[in-house]
Curated annotation (Swiss-Prot):
Belongs to the activator 1 small subunits family. Replication factor C (RFC) is a heteropentamer of subunits RFC1, RFC2, RFC3, RFC4 and RFC5 and forms a complex with POL30/PCNA in the presence of ATP. Component of the RAD24-RFC complex which consists of RAD14, RFC2, RFC3, RFC4 and RFC5 and associates with the checkpoint clamp DDC1:MEC3:RAD17 complex. Component of the ELG1-RFC complex which consists of ELG1, RFC2, RFC3, RFC4 and RFC5. Component of the CTF18-RFC complex, which consists of CTF18, CTF8, DCC1, RFC2, RFC3, RFC4 and RFC5. RFC3 interacts with ECO1 and POL30/PCNA. The keyword Acetylation applies. The lineage of its organism: Eukaryota, Fungi, Dikarya, Ascomycota, Saccharomycotina. Keywords: Acetylation, ATP-binding, Cell cycle, DNA replication, DNA-binding, Nucleotide-binding, Nucleus. One of its GO terms (biological process) is leading strand elongation. InterPro entries: AAA+_ATPase, ATPase_AAA_core, DNA_pol3_clamp-load_cplx_C, DNA_Rep/Repair_Clamp_Loader, P-loop_NTPase, Rep_factorC_C. NCBIfam families: PRK00440.1 (NF001679). Present with 3140 molecules/cell in log phase SD medium. The modification N-acetylserine is found at S2. GO terms for molecular function: ATP binding; ATP hydrolysis activity; DNA binding. The keyword ATP-binding applies. This is Replication factor C subunit 3. Its main location: nucleus.
Amino acid sequence: MSTSTEKRSKENLPWVEKYRPETLDEVYGQNEVITTVRKFVDEGKLPHLLFYGPPGTGKTSTIVALAREIYGKNYSNMVLELNASDDRGIDVVRNQIKDFASTRQIFSKGFKLIILDEADAMTNAAQNALRRVIERYTKNTRFCVLANYAHKLTPALLSRCTRFRFQPLPQEAIERRIANVLVHEKLKLSPNAEKALIELSNGDMRRVLNVLQSCKATLDNPDEDEISDDVIYECCGAPRPSDLKAVLKSILEDDWGTAHYTLNKVRSAKGLALIDLIEGIVKILEDYELQNEETRVHLLTKLADIEYSISKGGNDQIQGSAVIGAIKASFENETVKANV
């Protein structure tokens, strides 16, 4: 493939792949994990690994970059990548994993590596089968298990891996990656837009890149136009702080009918999901100064129950009324010191 063709091919990639770190030095925000894993490799004592933590924190990028440093051009022969959320049953363990782990490369020294992404989606039977395969083929194969939630993995599987928790990326790491992308894509991002993007990402770099790519697609002239915070909120489908405050102010100060009208008006005008409004309102309520902390406890518990009902398919109109009722009831005898 020619250089120009490769360049065009890379330009057409989703940004989460286009800007995926190729070396461990390019992985941001997980310095302790990188240092420890590198030490394992340098000493020739790489154990089975478990990387767990929220999405978009660099779990897959770290192990793939590590594997490329270890194997170089022989990567495709020595590494098997599987996504357990696609093949979550016992057959994938018995067939693909076992077949790969049981064979040796004639002209290659060292161990093979099996990367099992989203392993917390595997059934318990598949995890138990995987544990037996790990035990049997440890001599020539290493496993790296990736998961969002470690508690969804069986204790037997957990005990056979050295665990590393990937924290949500710190603001500094996200800012560095955003700056890098803006330079390469020749984009302009307002300070308020960058602040909104970092806040909405919750430490998820994958979401940052997806939102930036969506924002670029909305611009008439990407080389000249600046991405505003309104564009960020629009592409995220997230409520703006001003909308959240307007809804909360109406609930606290207006009668039931007006509050219900305001809530529905904001939702329909901005195309917002009720669950996003609840999450935004909770963040605002966390900063309120209350005379009685029991008010906060009672209200957050009620909102959590409503959020759970929505996740189980509850009617949005009914749950929207429940939100108004929960907030009004909780603040009925409470003096709010903070202004909306």
